Amino acid sequence: FAGNASAAAAEDAPLWFFWTLQRLEAQIGAKKIWKHYGEAMKQVLESYKRGVAGRVALNDNGLVWASSDEVPLTWMNSVIDGRSVTPRNGYQVEVNALWYNAVRYALRLAGEAGDTKFVKAWEKLPERTAASFNELFRLPKGYLADCVGCDGANTDIRPNMIVACGLPYKMLDEQTQLEVIRTVRQLSLIHI
């Protein structure tokens, strides 16, 4: 992501890297993860903080904002005649769940490795991210908005919200997770 213009069209891909490292940690341990991948993890997080190609940026509320009508920025977008089929400009639910997971994971590894400089620079962000996420994405209907943009919350029920329940570091309380899982399960059964 850092310095790679082609990666800017896949705002969630660098964040899945952290999830992959979480799986790898079970095999090789946290110390080796930080030793071999710590710098790459920091670079990815810093690239979001700086912003990427004028399309992806970390906002003051701790959430990642992405916007482009020409380039599909998430896994579910396709382009026809140069336009996104499913535009999701703004804060996407799965991207911000992945973002929170990535930051919390990096903070844990850095703390265990004694990287106090990194910890000091990033330690306050997760609380702000979680508060903003819950304020913007949680809907009274018991599920999460798919994305939140300039026009408000997109309340279409899409399976993207399940990512917020399936990562090692979550921003949702247990009751909300159960409601999200129930909603996604009902959606899946309806469309089979």
Annotate each language-model stretch with its function:
Residues 1-15, 57-88, 140-163:
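Carbohydrate-binding/catalytic loop surfaces
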Residues 1-73, 92-96, 100:
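Aromatic-rich carbohydrate-recognition surfaces in CAZymes
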Residues 49, 53-61, 100-189:
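Catalytic cores of carbohydrate-active enzymes
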Residues 39-40, 80, 186-189:
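Short, surface-exposed linear patches
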Residues 5, 29-36, 87, 94, ...:
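A structural signal for alpha-helical segments
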